[in-house]
Amino acid sequence: MEKFVERALLYDFYGELLTTRQQQVYEDVVLEDCSLSEVAEDLGIIRQGVHDMIKRCDKALSDYEEKLHLVEKFLNIRKQVQRIHELAAESHADEIAAISNVILEEL
């Protein structure tokens, strides 16, 4: 999985467990693609401080996933529902396809 996608998924699932400041910095640097220097200047800290905070956030998010496996479960369910959708399309089972579409959209 692409690193950005992995980080975004981890943040989607576990971001609320970070402090407000960590969330702000992580969103700015990782999701909004702001430079470390820009974020450091906005917060009045040094660039290294922002870098260290991002590293700590990545570690915390990875640790949550190692313990809870929510992203892994989500990806497995999504894969299974996609397979159901493929099978339903082959057998023209419109109702199954409709249900699987709803589930995929919710995921």
Located regions from the model:
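Short, Lys/Arg-enriched N-terminal segment that forms or immediately precedes the first helix
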Residues: 2-14
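Pre-recognition alpha-helix immediately N-terminal to the DNA-recognition helix
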Residues: 9, 24-25, 83
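Short amphipathic alpha helix immediately N-terminal
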Residues: 20-32
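DNA major-groove recognition helix of helix-turn-helix
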Residues: 29, 54, 61, 65
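Short alpha-helical "recognition helix" segments of helix-turn-helix
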Residues: 38-43
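Helix-turn-helix DNA-binding motif, specifically the short coil turn and the N-cap/start of the second
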Residues: 46-47
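Helix-turn-helix/homeodomain-like alpha-helical modules used for DNA recognition
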Residues: 79-107
